């Protein structure tokens, strides 16, 4: 349905040169392949052909536009996801052309909508699965607030590895509702998960002091 990917074509190379890739060192497919191969990743060709190179166990990056993708290992359609979230990427436009990119985005819209809808409906069920895995409510609140700071990342990785159908964003979205207790009345600090706070706050006084420089970064209060 779509044009065959050809990153060797001179026209494509010219177009990519014009947009000045953010990570020029990974402009070639071979370089992107090596980034996966040295970490013993299998079946990586679909990712490297989509312009992506290995960054970390939970993240890959487009060498051209710099967009990062989380929980990528089990993604079946990296090219479509890349085009959907980064429509102005020079690699995607040069590879598929404007018309091909538009067709791909349109065809992916229905799939994406369905996936989000299913995950949204199953959030209560998946919450129970997380509890069954041994994650307490307070612990999950704590991990969410510190998800992007070592050494707590490994717990997010544990969730992903045990429940392959979770996406990183969905896990964060799922866990974030633990700011409000299940009775929807008691509100807890998003860092320690122990101290009760007002509903218009996210952290207790002690955690605000400890995490002052991260306060804006951690200040999210999604409620399901």
Swiss-Prot record:
Tell me the superkingdom of the source: Viruses
**Record's CDD domains?**
BIR
Q: Which Gene3D superfamilies match?
A: Inhibitor Of Apoptosis Protein (2mihbC-IAP-1), Chain A (1.10.1170.10)
One Pfam family it belongs to: ASFV_p27
Q: What induces it?
A: Expressed in the late phase of the viral replicative cycle.
Q: Record-annotated residues binding Zn(2+)?
A: 62, 65, 82, 89
Q: Does the keyword Metal-binding feature in the UniProt annotation?
A: yes
Q: What is its main location?
A: host cell
- Give compartment(s): Host cytoplasm; Virion
User: Is Zinc one of the keywords UniProt gives this record?
Assistant: yes
* Keyword list, A-Z: Activation of host NF-kappa-B by virus, Host cytoplasm, Host-virus interaction, Inhibition of host caspases by virus, Metal-binding, Modulation of host cell apoptosis by virus, Virion, Zinc, Zinc-finger
Q: Which PROSITE patterns match?
A: BIR_REPEAT_1, BIR_REPEAT_2
- BIR repeat coordinates: 29-92
Annotated GO CC locations: host cell cytoplasm; virion component
Q: Which SMART domains match?
A: BIR (SM00238)
Q: Where are the zinc fingers (C4-type)?
A: 189-207
| Gene Ontology terms, MF aspect | zinc ion binding
In the record, biological process GO terms are:
symbiont-mediated activation of host NF-kappaB cascade; symbiont-mediated suppression of host apoptosis
Question: How does this chain assemble?
Answer: Interacts with subunit p17 of host CASP3.
Similarity comment: family membership: Belongs to the asfivirus IAP family.
- Function according to Swiss-Prot or TrEMBL: Prevents apoptosis of host cell by inhibiting caspase-3/CASP3 activation to promote the viral replication. Also induces the activation of host NF-kappaB.
**What is the name attached to this protein's record?**
Inhibitor of apoptosis protein
The organism of origin for this protein? African swine fever virus (isolate Pig/Kenya/KEN-50/1950) (ASFV)
């Amino acid at each position: 349905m779509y044009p065959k990917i050809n990153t060797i074509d001179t026209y494509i190379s010219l177009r990519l040169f014009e947009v000045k890739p953010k990570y020029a060192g990974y402009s070639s497919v071979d370089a992107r392949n090596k980034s996966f191969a040295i970490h013993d990743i299998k079946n990586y060709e679909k990712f490297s052909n989509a312009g992506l190179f290995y960054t970390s166990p939970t993240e890959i990056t487009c060498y051209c536009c710099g967009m990062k993708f989380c929980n990528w290992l089990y993604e079946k359609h990296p090219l479509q996801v890349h085009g959907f979230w980064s429509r102005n990427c020079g690699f995607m436009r040069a590879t598929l052309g404007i018309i091909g990119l538009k067709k791909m985005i349109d065809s992916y819209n229905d799939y994406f909508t369905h996936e989000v809808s299913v995950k949204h409906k199953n959030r209560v069920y998946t919450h129970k699965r997380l509890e069954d895995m041994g994650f307490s409510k307070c612990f999950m609140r704590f991990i969410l607030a510190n998800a992007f700071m070592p050494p707590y990342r490994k717990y997010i990785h544990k969730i992903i590895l045990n429940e392959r159908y979770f996406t990183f964003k969905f896990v964060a979205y799922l866990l974030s509702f633990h700011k409000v207790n299940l009775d929807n009345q008691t509100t807890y600090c998003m860092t320690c998960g122990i101290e009760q706070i007002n509903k218009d706050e996210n952290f207790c006084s002690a955690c605000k002091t400890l995490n002052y420089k991260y306060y804006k970064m951690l200040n999210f209060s999604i409620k399901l």
